Amino acid sequence: MVLLHVLFEHAVGYALLALKEVEEISLLLPQVEECVLNLGKFHNVVRLVAFCPFSSSQVALENANAVSEGVVHEDLRLLLETYLPSKKKKVLLGVGDPKIGAAIQEELGYNCQTGGVIAEILRGVRLHFHNLVKGLTDLSACKAQLGLGHSYSRAKVKFNVNRVDNMIIQSISLLDQLDKDINTFSMRVREWYGYHFPELVKIVNDNATYCRLAQFIGNRRELNEEKLEKLEEITMDGAKAKAILDASRSSMGMDISAIDLINIESFSSRVVSLSEYRQSLHTYLRSKMSQVAPSLSALIGEAVGARLIAHAGSLTNLAKYPASTVQILGAEKALFRALKTRGNTPKYGLIFHSTFIGRAAAKNKGRISRYLANKCSIASRIDCFSEVPTSVFGEKLREQVEERLSFYETGEIPRKNLDVMKEAVVQAEEAAAEITRKLEKQEKKRLKKEKKRLAALALASSENSSTPEECEEVNEKSKKKKKLKPQENGMEDPPVSLPKSKKKKAPKEELASDLEEMATSSAKRKKSSPKEEVASEPEEAASPTTPKKKRKFSEEPEVAANFTKSSTKKKKKSQKAQED
């Protein structure tokens, strides 16, 4: 009998479940489908065989990416090889995603099944998963799902910063909108200022230049020879400046009030600022296209290439389109109208704005548009899937389109595609090596700057951390100096050594010891008196600045102590002699 197992992928790990022996037909009954909602009844049908938790969120993200791409991860392979029976013919594995099922069947040899009964079982497992796995709560499972969802979405959205085509889509859309707005506002300025100076409309055709002139001239009656030089700077043409000056003198326009002029000038300044922003945005779009799709922009131009990417949705979608779709991209209405009325289908869409189709003869427009769409499809695929995109292939493809145009006009045979691509491959490798070399240099410079910055921060932090310790050391030194200063000046009394308490002796022993001490002390006094006087003389010579009173004051406690000792000893001896 074939054993049915079910693989369930969760944010916390893989779960392998086994179905108890129940007929497949009975599982599809409505009563059984309702029993899926009941945990107790669901346990009678399904049991957990093994659970392989993910060690970290990064591992969970890797497994989720592998499942979405239809690749068998090593963790999944280990789980299936460990817990599924060795006899693969007797095992039927139910999975939710057909891609991962096909990959498991191809790599591991297990028969996989999706849909029907498996979908109902997975619905029940998804509902009761936190009860099937021990130690897993509903709250922790929800948190794991939320974290994995955020990281998975972030990985899908996060691409190379230099190759994000979303910025191109937004830029070209804004550029088209700005063109419409500038055109509308310029026409409003022409109508508004035309009541005062109608001849200026015929002389100047450019919208931005007209708005600058309206802002500069103001009241035409104030225009004179002194402003002619400024007019030449704005119009970039001396003849036009002279014509404007002559027309202002003999204009048939009506007079205008000061408040109306103020409003016209403020509105024309807004239009001028919009036109300047449009130029800066166009420059930004060109630089972005050279980074994201250099071959496509070299072949067909930045504006047309950006419109193709925006219409397709992304550069990847454009690369997936065949040449026939690229040819009519942007002409969907005409295409479906032609299919509906069974008329002629359009020959070109957005690529009509390319210069090649405009240069071709009427009978060759369809042929050159088909050839150009083919080259655009190749260029978009090169830009999308090359590691280091360069404009070499786009330049070579442009040369091929030029040769095909000349072939249609003059009959000159173009070069073979194989020869052109060989040259392009060699040049592209050299260009890619040069780009990688520049990038490595930039990275080294950035790392050096980062190291210097970190070293400066570490030095500053070490200085800040050492300052309190240094302050404490200075404070301790100052305290020590304060303590030592009175001793050096002799103002502080030296510590007096108190006589140690001696044990009481017998009276005879005390008398004998007192007599011996008296004899020895008298002998010492006689010997030490001349030496002390001699020894005191060098000290006085060495320190002549110290006053004698202070020195005597510092010596008085020792003398007083010796004198009190000798007097007490004499009194004790006299008392003992009287008692005897």
Curated annotation (Swiss-Prot):
- Residues annotated as carrying Phosphoserine in the record are 314, 465-466, 513, 522, 528, 536, 543, 554, 567
A Pfam family recorded for this sequence: NOP5NT
Q: Does the keyword Electron transport apply?
A: no
At what positions is N6-acetyllysine found?
552, 565
Question: Phosphothreonine (modified residue): where?
Answer: 467, 545-546
Q: Residues involved in crosslink (Glycyl lysine isopeptide (Lys-Gly) (interchain with G-Cter in SUMO2))?
A: 87, 230, 240, 531
Domain (Nop) ranges: 292-410
Mind listing the GO biological process terms from this record? Answer: ribosomal small subunit biogenesis
Gene Ontology molecular function: any one: RNA binding
- Tissues where the protein occurs: Widely expressed, with highest levels in the central nervous system (CNS), including cerebral cortex and cerebellum, and spleen. In the CNS, expressed in Purkinje cells of the cerebellum, as well as in motor neurons of the hypoglossal nucleus and in the spinal cord anterior horn (at protein level).
What Gene Ontology terms describe where this protein resides (cellular component)?
A: box C/D methylation guide snoRNP complex; cytoplasm; fibrillar center; nucleoplasm; pre-snoRNP complex; small-subunit processome
Primary residence: nucleus
Give the modified residues of type Omega-N-methylarginine. 359
Q: What does this protein do?
A: Involved in the early to middle stages of 60S ribosomal subunit biogenesis. Required for the biogenesis of box C/D snoRNAs such U3, U8 and U14 snoRNAs. Part of the small subunit (SSU) processome, first precursor of the small eukaryotic ribosomal subunit. During the assembly of the SSU processome in the nucleolus, many ribosome biogenesis factors, an RNA chaperone and ribosomal proteins associate with the nascent pre-rRNA and work in concert to generate RNA folding, modifications, rearrangements and cleavage as well as targeted degradation of pre-ribosomal RNA by the RNA exosome.
Q: How does it assemble?
A: Part of a large pre-ribosomal ribonucleoprotein (RNP) complex, that consists of at least 62 ribosomal proteins, 45 nonribosomal proteins and both pre-rRNA and mature rRNA species. Within this complex directly interacts with TCOF1 in an RNA-independent manner. Core component of box C/D small nucleolar ribonucleoprotein (snoRNP) particles; the core proteins SNU13, NOP56, NOP58 and FBL or FBLL1 assemble stepwise onto the snoRNA. Interacts with NOP1 and NOP58. Interacts with NUFIP1, RUVBL1 and RUVBL2; RUVBL1:RUVBL2 seem to bridge the association of NOP56 with NUFIP1.
Per the record, the similarity remark reads: Belongs to the NOP5/NOP56 family.
| Record protein name field | Nucleolar protein 56
